[in-house]
Amino acid sequence: MGALWSLCRRRVNSIGDVDGGIINLYNDYEEFNLETTKLIAAEEGRACGETNEGLEYDEDSENDELLFLPNKKPN
């Protein structure tokens, strides 16, 4: 992971996180590691087809997918 952080640090000053915030790669190595782990987990969940099945139904929603793991491309 250190090599990845080093490479990214040379290329960009900051990166967006899963929650919509910004991580400064120069100052926050631990946060970068944590966010990378979250992003990898989100991608693995998307690959496995995780959904919100069993959760409270929202009539306004056209699908039951996790908001942070969209399986469909927006129109």
UniProtKB/Swiss-Prot annotation:
Pfam family, one: Herpesvir_UL11
Region (Interaction with BGLF2): 28-31
Domain of life of the native organism: Viruses
GO (cellular component) term, any one: host cell Golgi membrane
Spans through the membrane: none
Keyword check for Membrane: yes
Record PTM: Myristoylation and palmitoylation (probably on one or more of the nearby cysteines at the N-terminus) enable membrane-binding and Golgi apparatus-specific targeting and are essential for efficient packaging.
Main location (coarse class): virion
Lipid bilayer topology: Lipid-anchor
Lipidation (N-myristoyl glycine): G2
Chain spans, region Disordered: 53-75
Subcellular location(s) per record: Virion tegument; Virion membrane; Host cell membrane; Host Golgi apparatus membrane
Disulphide bridges, residue numbers: none
Biased composition (Acidic residues): 53-65
Example GO BP: viral budding from Golgi membrane
Sorted UniProt keywords: Host cell membrane, Host Golgi apparatus, Host membrane, Lipoprotein, Membrane, Myristate, Palmitate, Phosphoprotein, Virion, Virion tegument
Job description of the protein: Plays an important role in the cytoplasmic envelopment of tegument proteins and capsids during the assembly and egress processes. Also participates in viral entry at the fusion step probably by regulating the core fusion machinery.
Family under the similarity heading: Belongs to the herpesviridae cytoplasmic envelopment protein 3 family.
Subunit structure, interactors included: Interacts with BGLF2; this interaction is essential for the proper localization of each protein to the assembly complex and thus for the production of infectious virus.
Name of the protein in question: Cytoplasmic envelopment protein 3
Protein source organism: Epstein-Barr virus (strain B95-8) (HHV-4)
